[in-house]
Amino acid sequence: MRYPNLKKYGFSERFELEASFYEGLYPARVTEQHRNIYRVICEDGELQAEVSGKLQYAAECTMDFPAVGDWVMIDRIDGNSGSVMIRSILRRKSFFARRAAGGKEDVQIVAANVDTIFICMSLNTDFNLRRLERYMSIAWDSMATPVIVLTKSDLCDDIEDKIREVSSVSAGADIMICSNAEERGIDAVYRYIEEGKTIAFIGASGVGKSTLINRLMGREVLATKEIRESDDRERHATRHTASCFYCLRAEWSSIRPG
């Protein structure tokens, strides 16, 4: 492989082949987006990037702009002269999206080229099968593999009944039971984490996504806040969530047990 350092970020033979047709450009993966400014990881490290004027002009909707997780082609791999330019976006193998803000008809891509989506739902006050079905639909439409993660099992007295209810709408997706408080079920998540694979977490505010990620990392990489005693919900603290998954994924591959 011509770009060995990018392999751990999911740069497969399929992307390498497509990138080979862009003479004079270099592949990179988008790890963060803040309005019109991007962070990308290339063979030599992380850089700040912007979309080229030509790509902006050719864009017909928001889906034609880079999103977190996209593989893009940039004009150089050094940051000595300001932002590098994103010239093209490689064809996405998967993406999940939502309606753009402001009631527009346009669709905004939340994350691209995801292999596995962990759908998190707590077993206490957040338990909602209709919401789970909506998340499942989003996951299947994205072309990624959904995995259902039921959190806060330590706060549930009827786990078996809840599992039966979830199984009735799971469409065959794997189901895992976790307790961040007791670290129960965390090891089961590791079998989905491997070099070159990208995972994402979705779920309602307060279900324990940030805490679960911190458990996987073995340190606090995403902020969490205290649990409200009134309803056992963790106050929402995650920001730029989708962008974090790609920065962390390479590290996850190195902390698998064994």
Describe every region a protein language model picked out.
Residues 143, 172-174, 221, 251:
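A generic structural signal for alpha->beta connector loops
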Residues 210-211, 215:
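Walker A/P-loop
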Residues 145, 152-207:
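Canonical P-loop GTPase G-domain recognition
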Residues 78-81, 91-94, 123-126, 152-157, ...:
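Conserved nucleotide-binding/hydrolysis micro-motifs of P-loop NTPases
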Residues 219-253:
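Switch I (effector-binding) loop of TRAFAC-class P-loop GTPase G-domains
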Residues 87, 176, 255:
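General small-molecule cofactor/ligand-binding pocket signal
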Residues 1-129:
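N-terminal accessory targeting/assembly segments
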Residues 109-172:
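Phosphate-binding glycine-rich loops and their immediate beta-loop-alpha structural context
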